[in-house]
């Protein structure tokens, strides 16, 4: 039988501690145990949570549960005995909600500053396992109207077409756009293809009257700003 948290004094159970003390007082193990809900045969949910965090730390030192974002489905389920697809889905949903919530407060920040753009995008993009091209739509005050993913997969000029990049910008009456894509390798150094795509999009933006303010290449813990590097030419 699965060891039960009911054997613990009620005051020591994670859910009860959260309700009484607030989530900030709980350890990562306790918060993860609440998400998992139950343990596995012969192991309590606390033990499963502790093992999962240990394995994630081994794969990505200092990264914690973020390691799960880089793994394939089969690899996630093999990390810890008793971690089935349903529990993996619950954890991933919690992680992505946290990433989106951490990005939301920056929506009214002046995103002409490349560092602010990176801090806005990093929770969404820095840990993606595949390459994505995003367009940030801005109003006249450089506040975010929306963010749209226009391409997924290795970037090529055929995938990132000006028509797709500016279609929503025109429809939403955007004043300007900021381009961004991630490098799953973690290295934000722009490739020759990145430079060519940027050049074409800057030219297209000038023709239709929607300025491309910057293009950021997002890596893990760092970024390259085309504007800062003097590469925003067309």
UniProtKB/Swiss-Prot annotation:
Superkingdom, taxonomy of origin: Bacteria
This protein's UniProt keywords: Hydrolase, Metal-binding, Metalloprotease, Protease, Zinc
Locus of motif JAMM motif: 181-194
GO molecular function, one term: metal ion binding
GO BP terms in the entry: proteolysis
Gene3D superfamilies referenced in this protein's UniProt entry, alphabetically: Cytidine Deaminase, domain 2
CDD domains: MPN_DUF2466
InterPro entries, A to Z: MPN, RadC_JAB, UPF0758, UPF0758_CS, UPF0758_N
Residues covered by the MPN domain: 110-232
Binding locations of Zn(2+): 181, 183, 194
NCBIfam families reported for this sequence: PRK00024.1, radc
Family the entry assigns: Belongs to the UPF0758 family.
Descriptive protein name: UPF0758 protein STH371
Species this protein is from: Symbiobacterium thermophilum (strain DSM 24528 / JCM 14929 / IAM 14863 / T)
């Amino acid at each position: 039988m699965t060891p039960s948290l009911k054997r613990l004094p009620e005051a020591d159970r994670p859910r009860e501690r959260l309700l009484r003390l607030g989530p900030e007082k709980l350890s990562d193990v306790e918060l993860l145990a609440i998400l998992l809900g139950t343990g596995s045969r012969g192991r309590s949910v606390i033990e499963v949570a502790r093992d999962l965090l240990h394995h994630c730390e081994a794969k990505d030192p200092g990264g914690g549960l973020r390691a799960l974002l880089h793994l394939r489905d089969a690899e996630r389920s093999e990390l810890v005995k008793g971690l089935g697809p349903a529990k993996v889905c619950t954890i991933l949903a919690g992680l992505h909600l946290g990433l989106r919530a951490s990005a939301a407060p920056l929506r009214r920040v002046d995103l002409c500053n490349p560092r602010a753009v990176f801090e806005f995008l990093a929770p969404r993009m820095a840990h993606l396992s595949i390459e994505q091209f995003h367009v940030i739509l801005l109003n006249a005050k450089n506040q975010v109207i929306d963010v749209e993913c226009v391409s997924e997969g290795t970037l090529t000029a055929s995938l990132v077409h000006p028509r797709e990049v500016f279609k929503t910008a025109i429809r939403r009456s955007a004043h300007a756009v900021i381009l961004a894509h991630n490098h799953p390798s973690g290295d934000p150094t722009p490739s020759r293809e990145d430079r060519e795509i940027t050049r074409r999009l800057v030219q297209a933006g000038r023709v239709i009257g929607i300025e491309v303010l910057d293009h950021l290449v997002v890596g893990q813990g760092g970024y390259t700003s085309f504007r800062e590097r003097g590469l925003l030419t067309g």
